Amino acid sequence: MCATMENLPDCTQSVGRSSATSLQSNPQMDSITVFAQNYYGMTLILGIALLIFGGHLLVEGSVAIATRLGISKLVIGLTIVAFSTSSPELALNIIASMNGHSELCLGNIFGSNIANIGLVLGIGALICKLPVTGRIIKVEFPLLIFATLIVGVATLIGTLNAYWAIGFLCLFSFLMWTWFRIGNEDESQVAMQSEGAISEVQYSTIGAWAMLLTGLVLLALGGKATEIGAVTGALSLGMSEIVVGGTVVAIATSLPEVVTTIIAAKKGHPDLAVGNVVGSNIFNILFVLPITILVNPISISSDVWLYVVVMFVMTVLAWFLTMDSRIKPKEGGILVGLYIAFLAYVTFSIVT
């Protein structure tokens, strides 16, 4: 019998390992096990829904407050909107890291980056050609590749500690300074590109703050619910935390980007897709990951390597596909196909 919430994963794992024996001795155990798995499945779904909705409220409230304070759309687009795309991952990782679930955190970050390229860019390119600015090709993509390579080196060493976190945050700060400096040289163009991601709805000051605070609360609740559902559900099914974080949770937390890309493409703003994906992936590695590390240092297991390699290969491939300043539908099909192959390999590994 588990007395505390922290003991839930251990108890669930024990139930999962002994389920075959227990079913022979207790016919009622089958329905009990199914109910437990459904419960944690519903908890996972509820947690993800809270993360997505909480992130939406957070960005709506933040944008409204920033607008009322006279902050330009350029600054909003480069900071708040970029943060909003990674807020579900950040909320989940902080809570999961506090409870020692480091593999779930890494799976969430790496899996989200893989899904952003394979699903978001792939599906967006299948709908229409995605134009890519020269700045993304020459600055943001190489920086993303460099950051991904550094993460690979860190995983090879075996531990992600505070030194790595400080290094990532320094690089992120330099990138933010570069964004603002380059943005000021051509503010009108960047502001116009960011405009499609910023709501035009006007809210009162009280309403904006209410949305922001409600969003933060929902993110906290959603992060805890997702952690419980993912960890305990995975263990009951014999899956590792990194598999759940890198597939189920990663796909779910990337759904807002998928929907946004589809809507942007249909409304004639496909240029937002590549910039949003690259920005979100940079944010995940250079901000979400170091914050997670500062909460609790991460020890790397051998299972993490698959996700690091796939993330690096997908990132480099996407960069090469943008060399002619666009991603064509057939190239989008390649990205989606590779992502499906990745999921198939992970599924096959679980089964075997």
What are these regions (language model features)?
Residues C2-S19, L23-T352:
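Hydrophobic alpha-helical segments, chiefly the membrane-spanning helices
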